[in-house]
């Protein structure tokens, strides 16, 4: 099983921003190879927001990439602020979405000071919160943007979790090999290790200061009965993790199963999913023996099916 890596990345030292500075072809494949998000997921967010008397005027789609979910948000909100740390991603978003009902910003979510205080009804962060090195600072910036009673909606999903334990084992080793390749070119390896640990398992992000967010925020773990998000962190680098646990003492933790997030891939679909990760565009030979293991498992009758694990965090801004 060969994987076409037509967009090789330079072996120079890279920042977090450079890792996900990808061209339009990457984002097209990203939409195909990542979960097709069911509408019930968005409806749960909208219902939470409405249930806490939230307005549907302005939403900030932070860390939006090239606006993967911005059009969906525009179907409910009058105005969507689309922001990303990568200028090229924002340019692609503006080109694809147009400007009616949208505005565009380039910058880190913890540094977008030009967004007026208490001017946003919802801050929506999908698959991006783990990139903020200073989680506390990022949450202060998000809280500052939100109107009293506004909603912070954050989710992490993307890496598949396969039903067959043998397939899942190989997928974990593929992911960890990708993590090794990314760490070889990371300009701040410890920071990149912490990004990896935030983005795996139960998605360890978003410390919720109860002076800024009401108690009993929701942390909902979907389809995580056998494990959370498959991570990139190589086991030999776990001793370098410095990230604290961000679950709060009063956060409401629930585990649920949702069949709408199930998938069933063939080998081409597996390849397409792999190519949604930045390490796919590195050294192809580093994965050769792992592809052979997957092919052999499929020949033996293993199915490439399972469910996407999802973490959803919902919190309400205090009135202070």
Curated annotation (Swiss-Prot):
Residues 61-154 are annotated as: Methyltransferase domain. Methyltransferase; part of the gene cluster that mediates the biosynthesis of geodin, an intermediate in the biosynthesis of other natural products. The pathway begins with the synthesis of atrochrysone thioester by the polyketide synthase (PKS) gedC. The atrochrysone carboxyl ACP thioesterase gedB then breaks the thioester bond and releases the atrochrysone carboxylic acid from gedC. The atrochrysone carboxylic acid is then converted to atrochrysone which is further transformed into emodinanthrone. This is Methyltransferase gedG. One of its GO terms (biological process) is methylation. Residues 235-252 have a biased composition (Basic and acidic residues). Keywords: Methyltransferase, S-adenosyl-L-methionine, Transferase. One of its GO terms (molecular function) is S-adenosylmethionine-dependent methyltransferase activity. SUPFAM superfamilies: S-adenosyl-L-methionine-dependent methyltransferases. It holds the Pfam family Methyltransf_11. Pathway: Secondary metabolite biosynthesis. The keyword DNA-binding does not apply. Its EC number is 2.1.1.-. Coiled coil: none annotated. CDD domains: AdoMet_MTases (cd02440). Belongs to the methyltransferase superfamily. Residues 231-252 are annotated as: Disordered.
